[in-house]
A protein has these predicted regions:
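An N-terminal amphipathic alpha-helical segment
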Residues: 1-36
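Acidic, low-complexity, intrinsically disordered interaction modules
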Residues: 28-70
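Short, low-order "capping/linker" segments at domain edges
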Residues: 74-78
């Protein structure tokens, strides 16, 4: 069973980190039920060092998920 309250809280924590570190640049932040993960796509493309730095700021484990149509993508497995 999906715990939507936990998902929403985690999304809020992710949004807070992104806004604090990069400013408002979230294109998409949503839960993918098939992957059982939160997916994040930014509106900008980050360099490798920036990706590593941002990943270290998140309160939950994050993985680089490649390049999307709008920017860098990350995934957070629940």
């Amino acid at each position: 069973m999906t715990d939507f309250d936990s998902i929403w809280r985690t999304q809020d924590e992710i949004r807070t980190v992104v806004n604090a570190v990069l400013g408002e640049c979230i294109w998409n932040l949503s839960y993918n039920e098939r992957r059982m993960a939160i997916e994040l796509e930014l509106t900008k493309y980050l360099e490798e060092e920036e990706v590593d730095m941002l990943i270290n700021q998140f309160p939950v484990t994050a993985e680089y998920d490649g390049i999307g149509s709008k920017g860098t993508k990350f995934v957070f497995y629940m």
